[in-house]
Amino acid sequence: MKLLNVINFVFLMFVSSSSFAQVIEMNNSSLRDFVTWYSKQTGESVIVSPDVKGTVTVYSSDVKPENLRDFFISVLRANNFDMVGSIPSIIQKYNPNNQDYIDELPSSDNQEYDDNSAPSGGFFVPQNDNVTQTFKINNVRAKDLIRVVELFVKSNTSKSSNVLSVDGSNLLVVSAPKDILDNLPQFLSTVDLPTDQILIEGLIFEVQQGDALDFSFAAGSQRGTVAGGVNTDRLTSVLSSAGGSFGIFNGDVLGLSVRALKTNSHSKILSVPRILTLSGQKGSISVGQNVPFITGRVTGESANVNNPFQTVERQNVGISMSVFPVAMAGGNIVLDITSKADSLSSSTQASDVITNQRSIATTVNLRDGQTLLLGGLTDYKNTSQDSGVPFLSKIPLIGLLFSSRSDSNEESTLYVLVKATIVRAL
């Protein structure tokens, strides 16, 4: 009977000690796995910052449940990370501000940390004066406001803070002192505003050098006056050989210009792009070919002569337009515009593909609804063609009587018309 009591006592002591202490052994385990283990052990919700990466090595023979949080934070600190906030807590890069030290970790011994970066003099215990709160963003993407909110928080406190976004529900998760969070909604109301959109309508075309197009019905009326750039009230003189090659026009110049170009045999419309983008966001459109260019070739000892090795890089060749518009409060539009018109050359003088490149890149200030004309990019094409009667054209001396040679010179100028219109937010 006494022997049975002793066995029961030893069994109860073993179960009791197992329920109050844990043996933790981790060798080069992922830091995220360590966080997952802690969350399962304590039942706490934890948000992990994207910059939390690395491994951790921990050996501990006696960690009691009431000391598990302090133990977990100490391991994080030893690896230059930290856990801040209440529920949910946030794992982030360690910030030494707003931390207290104690000489030793209570009720936990035989612990080893494989990291020389751990600060000497004791363990860390955070001051839990940060509060974690979520904020619903209604008009812009939450991730676009992270840097702005971080600036607001850090300019009002020197304590540790963190700002994350939840893209699926468009939320901001902010961990900061409570007085900062109380003032944050008022600040968010000044930056969480509806954003205007900009409609960019373009017309990329080329005309033969010296030819003038009759645009008088498009720009000669009162609605089509020139707003600036050249001293004329008719788009015809702007596009003629005697006129300039830039200008800003009021009225529906773009739409009527398309009709005039279609009826002129000496003009060619290359592209009519339409781009709708948010103010402050880049928009682009392109059409063309993806052409391979040889960037390297090996035919020596390291490669089979019958099957030489070469590297190829593909690049887009065609018509493209890229814009970056910003709508101002007064109705102006600051517009960064880049337009390219690339084509493949018919020349066979080179061993690889030759491309003809024409591009315009500029920054302009337009009023809502105005049309901008840019141009003056001239392209020269010289072609020669030999033809003759087969066999007879190869006879010496008299062969010239049965052959002919034709040379042609083409000269064209590229122009770009761009109209910017503000689409007000509802």
UniProtKB/Swiss-Prot annotation:
PROSITE patterns: T2SP_D. Belongs to the inovirus G4P protein family. This is Virion export protein. The keyword Ribonucleoprotein does not apply. Keywords: Host membrane, Membrane, Signal, Transmembrane, Transmembrane helix, Viral extrusion, Viral release from host cell. InterPro entries: Bact_Secretion_Sys_Channel (IPR050810), GspD-like_N0 (IPR049371), GspD/PilQ (IPR001775), NolW-like (IPR005644), NolW-like_sf (IPR038591), T2SS/T3SS_dom (IPR004846), T2SS_GspD_CS (IPR004845). Residues 1-21 form the signal peptide. The chain crosses the membrane at residues 317-337. Homomultimer. The channel is composed of 14 G4P subunits that confer a barrel-like structure. Interacts with G1P; this interaction results in a complex that spans the inner an outer host membranes. It is found in: Host membrane. One of its GO terms (cellular component) is host cell membrane. It is a single-pass type I membrane protein. It comes from the Viruses. GO terms for biological process: protein secretion; viral extrusion. Acts in the assembly and extrusion of the bacteriophage by forming a channel across the host outer membrane. This channel is just large enough to allow a newly synthesized phage particle to pass through. Extrusion is a process of concomitant assembly and secretion and takes place at specific assembly sites where host inner and outer membranes are in close contacts.
